[in-house]
Amino acid sequence: MARKDNKEIFIGPDEGAHLPILDIAHKVPSESLGSAATIVEWGLPPGVMIPPHTHSREHECSYVLKGELTCDVGGEIVVAPVGSYVVKPRGVYHALCNAGTEPVWVIEMHAPGGFESWYDEYEQIASKFASGEIDEEEHRSTRAELSERYGVNFHDERIPEVMARFGIGP
């Protein structure tokens, strides 16, 4: 349901644009909150990690709806069960993982808003990578170019260390 100015005032459980490769659903776009925040929901299958990265513009807060989310926030590992919040301040690196056996589902808020556009653009890159249209090197370089525009820095060199700390991977 939208008001006359087209800003959302009610978003149902199955509403919001869904990005299938990333398994992210846009729930509250930044324009609905005067650019103050963006809210999305995302899922993470068992054994999957969101790589270490740092945001230079946004604070993030995750609320765990389902499963257990393992997080490395600035070097501190926390395991967040259902009902937990995980705060990831701007400028602090973080990585997120589903180290369990059940899917994880999270509500994520970015403040200020606008980061939903990164998800939209990265969905296209991830789709090309998943289909084999681009290789891993091009995937990383394209992701880096996109992320630079949005103030995100991925720390791929930390992936083996973080995977070991999360207890996942080879």
Give names to the regions the model predicted.
Residues 117-133:
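A hydrophobic, small-residue-rich beta->alpha segment in the mid-to-C-terminal subdomain
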Residues 57-69, 74:
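Glycine- and acidic-residue-biased ligand/ion/polar-headgroup-sensing regions
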Residues 1-37, 134-170:
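A short, N-terminal "cap"/entry segment at the start of jelly-roll beta-barrel domains
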Residues 26, 40-55:
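Conserved short histidine dyad/triad with adjacent acidic residue
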Residues 48, 56, 69, 117-120, ...:
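Hydrophobic small-molecule pocket/channel-lining residues, especially in calycin-type beta-barrels
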Residues 32, 75-93:
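Short acidic-glycine-tyrosine-enriched beta hairpin
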Residues 70, 90-116:
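Ligand-binding loop in jelly-roll beta-barrel domains
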